[in-house]
């Protein structure tokens, strides 16, 4: 009887303790995920088809599952378990205009915030039910590429304004960073890009230790009325005002597509660089908190390689980068995953997966078993596009 009471008391104390440890910030959520889910699974691998959808982003959730944002023609949000089985999904066809789920993040209240491309941000509860949405009402479309929740509960939205700046609208072609309140109200917007150049875009954003933001994107240069993309990393203060900027590129097409932050407040950014008009390489760069390039490398050889997403390993020893590749201009694209040493930028391993039609990977996250889960858009599994989800082990292998 004494022994039973002892364990009963321990159970009560454990319940009280767990009730007092409610995550109150984005970093708390991430720590909770690591603490409670790190023992799940053991190098589980699989390849799974989610029909009728395209997957653009994937994250780990605080209850040891995964959440995918994408498109069925409209935005879709899908919760899956660690084996790729659907738990629930939400679609948002009632929101007017074109929109698709470019990015998703878990919020401090257990819900999700979705960057839904054309002018749209969607906030949901923990099971994907819409709580509110915001349509950005400017003179031209503002394409939302990424959204994060700040440490104080607001949201930062980044992307690019569509259209040709020569058409007479000053905001067209500019990259933008926008701050929203917790309830979705726009507080301010700042736009960047050289005058008379189209399609400057911020593709990814993270919050810095000082409360500012570091952005990854593409910035166009006008040279004798010819436009060239540059790989672009920019730091702003908490109000979106520029503090430093890095541009890397020549007379071709270079883009920074995604970014992760390390614990020392440095950043690893990935995207693509052009070696010639027919040869693209994946590009990866590490940048200090003050904007100094610590290292940068290209990978791909003679292939056409583009990186679209990046995830940092829990121990910060490596990043896994995802994108797509093809061996020649006439061949179909295939998924490609790179493992890159975070200290040197050197390739540790690389894997290619694909069929006989176009397959492009866009989102990647480190899994709970230290493998990686990838989502994208595939046409190799039937006549219609599908979200082809690939779960690898820690070296990028699939059994």
Regions found by a protein language model. Name each.
Residues 21-399:
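A sequence-level/structural motif corresponding to short, flexible coil/turn segments enriched
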Residues 16-19:
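C-terminal motif of bacterial Sec signal peptides marking the signal peptidase cleavage site
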Residues 3-10:
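Sec-dependent signal peptide recognition
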